[in-house]
A protein has these predicted regions:
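Glycine- and hydrophobic-rich flexible loops that cap the catalytic core of alpha/beta enzyme folds
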Residues: 447-448, 452-461, 466-472, 476-643
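Stable alpha-helical elements in mature extracytoplasmic
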Residues: 204, 222-232, 236, 436, ...
Length: 941
């Protein structure tokens, strides 16, 4: 796909925009120091065999003139969109990929910048320089002192992501609407986040104090690094504000006057970094929860089938330890954790019909009230800004960014025993959605005790979080093991009277204590960017020693509050020490030292490592030791006997499982991860880890490569690229569907034609891929349409008659039926890339194989399709297929603000969600990491 890069230089673009705006809105560009050669690092052991990419581009800041030029002329500031084309092109280019073509689709990630490739050098102070390369504009930070190095990292982060960082610190503080506007999406997002991670200023400071008290010398160094990083951010922000080349979004959202320059960019504080860390933790580093919803579906199963049989049915759908699930650690070693106890104790099931969700929002006024929701007000602004009116009317971030299940990112790592060179090969990266600017930013940091290049979340980039060191590379995927429990807290009244469900006092160790109330009052007014009329509301969350109140209910007739207790709550920043270690070449020297560093990270991540000699894996997280007999999948009584072992509510700490009990491995033949089940006996925290998972798309391909031997970087990248355009349903479930349909001759011509289309598509690889680059038309387009229309219909036809409506709906709450690219309900909303993680693929697969009489390990408790009769099952599938085949494309793909109805390619297409003022072209769907590395180290220190 070709992308318009624009023939104007950034200066010319800005000048054109200035002419359009008038001199009063001119924003001079920052003056860079004279370019000087950047010294090549002599500590790079990759030998030119490390590559990476992060779309859409390194530049994430845009002046008001830049934004207007983008909206009027379609131009982009330098390096803000130059990675989108190469990233997109891999969807068509992967089949013929060779090692020497890798950097057509990726960039050389060697340390340093060759002298003839230096675009600019900035020296924000004497002890640090920021060199940017001509090809990508990525900052290469070189410091002579530790403080200067981190100051430079903060300065570079502000150069590239100042607006984004400011936005997310307000998200982290539950203040998005008051900062960016009252759009309905902004309201919903800040409410979802505040519900998960409500804090007050003392809580933020307490996290800093905890690191100082418990982190040793490394903890103290980490906070010193963070302070220098903050100082660098603030230095650039002040310079940009004074020089009037700050991000134009500050003008459009009413924070700075474009004519007088009145207003401010509020200085960042260390506590802002804690708020930012809480956002990262909530998005990608959590696991577990949902026990109330699990209890409700169990009750529905018990109501339909009786206590014993209903529990058995529920457990078969829960799939805590499915024997057919694809595993990351597949050498047979087990790591028992969070499984069902033999004799559950303390389970606190709600009385039927008693559960109510805890209210969050109070005191609504103006456009926050239902009566005035959607009301808009046009503010006065120069006519030249009309093109920018309402750019945030739909919000700055997806409404469901925090409410939807997430667990993205993938990894493919092969031991040197099976590669052509004898050196390990890895293709891996985080799948964090698509935003403009991107949530991640690329950087290289070289200074005392730090030597790394890679990606960091903007605003907490003191260290490279995912990337490469001198002779090793690392990456992560979300593991989301269960580190969150739900407690049923008994309510009480301080005067001894009978409490109601709404009581704000609870029992703790025999005392009747008041709940803490955490509040946030937000108000907004219309701006050029967000015309939502003025409004306000108050958010309120009650906190107990057992966590945050999420629901109210009765248990055995007694009123309770269900609370969510997350191990990482109040500890989101603790992981800073582990990331510091990853960047320290004096600490990470081999697989074991890398695993040791990963032990200092409390986020629930799968960590992968490769150097020239070894590969390794480690699963990190605060895996608490539960009381004996506690079922982690269901609510438990809030009593001392069922608390986490050594639980200290004052700081939310407990006894945790030792490192040896965390899933881990060194030099396994290969590792894959796409948020699949981690290891044998390691209980899945959520529904859906069964016989069919998108991890199978990787595992099948990498296993075949390893069996053949001679694996290269390109071969592994091809395997990833093929999986990235493959429909999981077509590859791993459609064969069983076709077996059932073909069990007898098909007489209906329309159905026969549909089956033939599906068979042809399946035989060709079940791909969702353009016929040629830029065609915007899929091969086997009709089969893809039929599959998209059929899947939700066939699941309902297969399961709803047997389960009954109530249980079917309850299980759909636990696990969504589908997650196709066009469904519009992906982890980061529609057009988000990541697909096929959450769905009923395993249920359909196991049920159909049982009906076909095939061997099924870990089967569903009952057959559902056609009541277990093959002919009746076939009839159900035929009927739903006929209905699906008749659906026109305009109904299957109804269109949205970005796509016309019936446009299949567009419905799938990835769109960089506009967080700043710049827009970008759509790209073809791929299911792959946002930031991605391809590495093969040539030698070792």
């Amino acid at each position: 796909m070709r992308f318009r890069t624009g023939k104007l230089t950034r200066v010319a673009i800005a000048a054109a925009a200035v002419l359009a705006l008038g001199a009063t809105f001119a924003a001079p560009l920052p003056q860079e120091a004279q370019a000087a050669p950047a010294a090549q690092a002599d500590t790079d052991y990759c030998g030119g065999q490390c590559s990476d990419i992060l779309p859409p581009g390194a530049t994430g800041n845009a002046t008001l003139a830049d934004i207007l030029a983008n909206r009027v002329f379609g131009t982009h500031p330098a390096h803000s969109a130059d990675q989108l084309g190469p990233y997109s092109d891999l969807a068509q280019g992967y089949p013929t990929l060779t090692d020497d073509k890798l950097n057509t689709f990726f960039n050389d990630s060697s340390f340093g910048v060759p002298a003839d490739q230096v675009e600019s050098v900035t020296k924000p102070r004497d002890d640090v320089s920021i060199t940017r390369d001509k090809k990508t504009g990525v900052p290469h930070i070189q410091g002579t002192t530790r403080e200067g190095t981190e100051f430079g990292a903060g300065y570079a982060a502000a150069q590239d992501r100042l607006w984004l960082m400011d936005l997310f610190r307000h998200v982290g503080r539950g203040e998005l609407t008051s900062f960016a506007g009252g759009a309905a999406s902004n309201q919903g997002l800040e409410q979802d986040f505040f519900r998960q991670a409500p804090y007050n200023e003392a809580d933020y400071q307490a996290q800093i104090d905890y690191i100082l008290a418990t982190g040793g010398e490394r903890g103290k160094q980490a906070l010193a690094d963070a302070q220098a990083y903050v100082d660098g951010i603030n230095a650039y922000a002040k310079k940009a504000k004074d020089g009037r080349y700050f991000p134009g979004e500050y003008v459009l959202t009413g924070h700075i006057d474009a004519i007088t320059n009145a207003g401010e960019i509020a200085p960042f504080k260390l506590t802002d970094l804690i708020a930012l860390a809480s956002v990262v933790g909530a998005l990608f580093g959590n696991g577990g929860g949902g026990e109330v919803e699990g209890a409700l579906s169990m009750l529905a199963a018990q109501q339909k089938y009786g206590l014993a049989e209903g529990t058995k049915v529920w457990e078969s759908f829960r799939q805590r330890n499915d024997p057919e699930a694809v595993l990351t650690v597949h050498d047979g070693k087990g790591f028992p954790y969070a499984d069902k106890p033999a004799s559950p104790k303390g389970t606190a099931m709600p009385d039927p019909g008693s559960v109510t969700a805890e209210p969050l929002v109070y005191d609504r006024e103006g456009s926050a009230t239902p009566a005035k929701a959607g009301a808009r007000t046009t503010v006065k602004a120069p006519a030249k800004l009309d093109k920018l009116r309402g750019i945030y009317d739909d919000g700055v971030l997806p409404r469901d960014l925090f409410s939807r299940k997430k667990g993205m990112s993938n990894a493919l790592v092969v031991s040197g025993k099976y590669t052509a060179s004898g050196k390990p090969v890895a293709v891996f990266g985080p799948q964090t959605g698509y935003f403009a600017p991107q949530l991640l930013m690329l950087q290289e940091i070289q200074g005392p005790g730090i030597s790394a290049r890679g990606a960091s979340f903007a605003g907490v980039g003191m260290y490279v979080q995912l990337g490469r060191g001198q002779d090793y590379a690392w990456s992560a995927t979300t593991s989301a093991q269960d580190v969150t429990d739900t407690y049923a807290v008994e309510l009480c009244s301080p005067d001894g009277s009978a409490p109601t469900k709404d009581a704000t006092y609870y029992r703790y160790h025999g005392e009747c204590l008041p709940m803490d109330k955490l509040e946030r009052r937000n108000a907004w007014k219309p701006t050029v960017a967000d015309s939502t009329a003025a409004g306000s509301y108050r958010m309120q969350v009650y906190r107990t020693k057992y966590g945050l109140v999420t629901h109210r209910a009765t248990v055995g007739g007694k009123p309770v509050a269900y609370t969510s207790l997350r191990a990482t709550y109040r500890h989101e920043a603790d992981s800073i020490v582990g990331f510091q270690m990853f960047n320290d070449p004096g600490y990470v020297t081999d697989a074991k030292s890398f695993q040791s560093a990963a032990q200092h990270i409390n986020y629930t991540f799968n960590w992968f490592y490769a150097d020239s000699r070894q590969t390794a894996y480690y699963n990190s997280g605060l895996n608490m030791r539960r009381a004996d007999g506690v079922d982690p999948s269901l609510p438990v009584k809030a009593e001392p006997a069922y608390e986490w072992k050594d639980f200290d509510p004052a700081v939310n700490t407990a006894a945790y499982t030792p490192a040896a009990e965390h899933p881990q491995s060194v030099d396994q033949d290969y590792y894959i991860s796409w948020n699949n089940k981690v290891a044998k006996d390691y209980g899945a925290a959520a529904f859906g880890n069964g016989s069919v998972h998108r991890g199978n798309l990787l595992d099948d391909r990498v296993r075949a490569l390893v069996k053949k031997g001679g694996v290269t970087r390109a071969a592994l990248a091809r395997a990833m690229g093929e999986a990235a355009v493959t429909d999981l349903r077509g590859e791993d479930v459609l064969p069983e569907l076709l077996k059932v349909l073909r069990s007898q001759p098909i007489d209906d011509p329309a159905v026969a034609s549909a089956v033939q289309s599906l068979e042809s598509w399946q035989a060709a690889g079940s791909q969702r891929r353009e016929t040629s680059a830029g065609s915007h038309t899929y091969g086997h387009t009709d089969a893809v349409r039929i599959m998209d229309a059929w899947w939700p219909l066939l699941v309902e036809a297969e399961f709803k008659p047997g389960l009954g409506g109530e249980l079917y709906d309850a299980l759909r709450t636990n696990l969504s039926v589908d997650e196709s690219p066009s469904a519009g309900h992906g982890p980061t909303g529609s057009h988000a890339g990541s697909s096929f993680q959450y769905g009923w693929w395993s249920y359909v697969d196991k049920d159909l194989r049982a009906v076909l009489g095939e061997d099924v390990k870990g089967p569903l408790a009952k057959p559902y399709c056609g009541g277990g009769e093959l002919s009746a099952c076939r009839d159900a599938l035929l009927g739903s297929l006929k209905q699906a085949a008749a659906k026109p494309a305009t109904e299957v793909y109804p269109g949205d603000d970005n796509c016309a109805a019936g446009d299949q390619w567009c419905a799938d297409a990835i769109i960089q969600r506009t967080v700043g003022g710049l827009t970008h072209d759509k790209i073809s769907w791929q299911n792959r990491p946002t930031f991605q590395q391809v590495v093969e180290f040539a030698r070792h220190r």
